[in-house]
Regions:
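N-terminal catalytic or cofactor-binding beta/alpha core of small enzyme domains
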Residues: 1-138, 143-257
Length: 258
């Protein structure tokens, strides 16, 4: 069994009507924001890579836009993106204009209705896989634009073809090496630049080293042109599949040693 869960948090553009009617932007302005903030076709990359892989991973996908809620934020004051109005429930747009006029109580309702059940479901899947095979590797799949957005905290950082987001506790040197090897032919690779860290469910964060995680932030112009797959799409999916196969092989080797 594959130890891998591909997490696809930002691929959807779906915004429920009851959420959309409280946003301060609509029409072309909202579509522009979705174009900027959606990790377009990362869901298709995950699906294509899964089909290519020898051992199929689990895919956990957010079916709602990150403008509804962002599953990868900390739901408290420790979230650094709160400073730009982009915690779990965004109050500002990517160019730092108002997105919502929302109270703390209203924000908490969204957290309770969307964020908490989502987090609990992913946490349950990780727990289930740990009980089944004793290890989990989360591939946190994202894409990002070639030009920095106003909300970004590290606008001056390099913007490589691939940013590997790592965590000191949950990302081993071996996992980084496997990712580097899988993507070695697709351009330059940096660590934690321009985005830092990787997703781990809060119940395991900083506590269980059996949960490994690495973020793949793929620069959009390497596989998309105006939101449409380019000639780089299939090689990118193939690289993800190569990483899946390498992780499954390592898992099999570890299992045979136990």
């Amino acid at each position: 069994m594959s130890p891998v869960i591909i997490h696809v948090p930002h691929a959807s553009t779906v915004i429920p009507k009851k959420i959309a009617e409280h946003l301060l932007i609509s029409g072309k302005e909202l579509q522009h924001e979705l174009d900027l903030m959606t990790d377009g076709l990362t869901d298709e990359l995950a699906s294509r890579a899964s089909k290519r892989a020898t051992m199929k991973p689990w895919i956990f996908e957010n079916k709602l836009s990150r403008l509804v809620f962002d599953p990868e934020r900390f739901p408290d004051e420790t979230e650094v993106m709160n400073q730009v109005g982009m915690g779990v429930v965004y109050s500002m747009t990517s160019d730092q204009k108002p997105l919502r006029d929302i109270s703390i109580a209203e924000s908490q309702k969204i957290i309770d209705h969307y964020f908490n059940p989502y987090s609990a479901a992913l946490q349950s899947l990780v727990k289930e896989r740990l009980e089944a095979i004793g290890q989990v590797v989360i591939i946190d799949l994202h894409s990002y634009p070639a030009v920095p957005s106003d909300y970004e905290l590290y606008k001056e950082s390099a913007r490589p073809a691939l940013c590997l987001g790592v965590d000191d506790f949950h990302t081993s040197e071996n996992l980084v090496a496997l990712a580097r090897n899988a993507f070695s032919g697709l351009g330059d690779i940096d660590i934690n630049s321009p985005f830092v860290g990787t997703y781990v469910p809060l119940a395991f964060y900083g506590k269980d080293p059996r949960v490994q995680s690495i973020m793949l932030e793929i620069r959009r112009d390497t596989f998309l042109t105006a939101g449409i797959p380019s000639q780089g799409f299939e090689p990118t999916a193939a690289a993800i599949a190569d990483l899946l196969d390498a992780l499954s092989l390592k898992s099999d080797e570890a299992g045979s040693e136990r």
